[in-house]
């Protein structure tokens, strides 16, 4: 699917339409939650919802600007989703954030007696479904929540949504790469990293 077929034009994009499409960032789901209706570009004939990558591009910029207000060590990146683990960890390591990949231990944000207890100021999750526990705890602690959301996700308790395919390996690599690059730019740092640096070989 080319940009001409979708008819999308981006204003000062982080990457080209073609690069977003090649990574599959626009590929949504066949199930829709009304919370995500504003992020739908169109519905394909087979019932697949296409994500509006114009809004993806805008939201990545917005989230990076928001995160740049925080000390990196106060940002907590969490993902249980397999394909999100490598790029999320890369993002956290690059900017100096806290991270947790794999199964989230209940109480990590709420029980100071746990060995892995952390006290961040803001939380980023890869999927509100798989990462529901950390969202619940962040809300209990009054922390803002940023989430990568697909068309089937509910966004209650999410403060900032990045609309994206949050199931595909390449899509997650692209979004975390762009978030890293834009965050560093907000901090006045020019990065030579490429999206390939965020792609796991597995």
Swiss-Prot record:
Q: Give a yes or no for keyword Ribonucleoprotein in this entry.
A: yes
- What's one GO-annotated cellular component? small ribosomal subunit
Note the Gene3D superfamilies from the entry: Glucose-6-phosphate isomerase like protein, domain 1 (3.40.50.10490)
Alphabetized UniProt keyword annotations: Ribonucleoprotein, Ribosomal protein
What's a Pfam family in this record?
Ribosomal_S2
Taken from the UniProt record, the cysteine pairs bridged by disulfide bonds within this chain are none
Q: Which residues form a coiled coil?
A: none
Question: Where does the signal sequence lie?
Answer: none
An example of a GO molecular function for this protein is: structural constituent of ribosome
Q: Which GO terms describe its biological process?
A: translation
Family the entry assigns: Belongs to the universal ribosomal protein uS2 family.
Task: State the protein's name.
Answer: Small ribosomal subunit protein uS2
């Amino acid at each position: 699917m080319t940009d001409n077929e979708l008819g999308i034009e981006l204003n000062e994009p982080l990457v080209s339409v073609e690069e977003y499409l090649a990574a599959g960032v626009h590929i949504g789901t066949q199930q829709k939650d009304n919370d995500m209706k504003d992020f739908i570009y169109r519905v394909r004939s087979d019932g697949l919802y296409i994500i509006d990558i114009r809004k993806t591009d805008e939201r990545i910029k917005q989230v990076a600007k928001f995160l740049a207000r925080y000390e990196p060590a106060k940002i907590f990146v969490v993902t249980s989703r397999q394909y999100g683990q490598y790029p999320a960890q890369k993002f956290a390591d690059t900017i100096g954030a806290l991270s947790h990949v794999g199964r989230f231990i209940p109480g990590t944000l709420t029980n100071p007696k746990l060995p892995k207890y952390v006290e961040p100021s803001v939380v980023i999750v890869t999927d509100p479904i798989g990462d529901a526990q950390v969202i619940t705890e962040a809300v209990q602690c009054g922390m803002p929540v940023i989430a990568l959301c697909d068309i089937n996700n509910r966004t209650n308790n999410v403060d900032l949504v990045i609309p994206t395919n949050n199931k595909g390996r390449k899509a997650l690599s692209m979004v975390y790469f762009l978030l890293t690059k834009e965050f560093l730019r907000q901090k006045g740092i020019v990065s030579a990293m490429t999206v390939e640096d965020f792609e796991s070989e597995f």
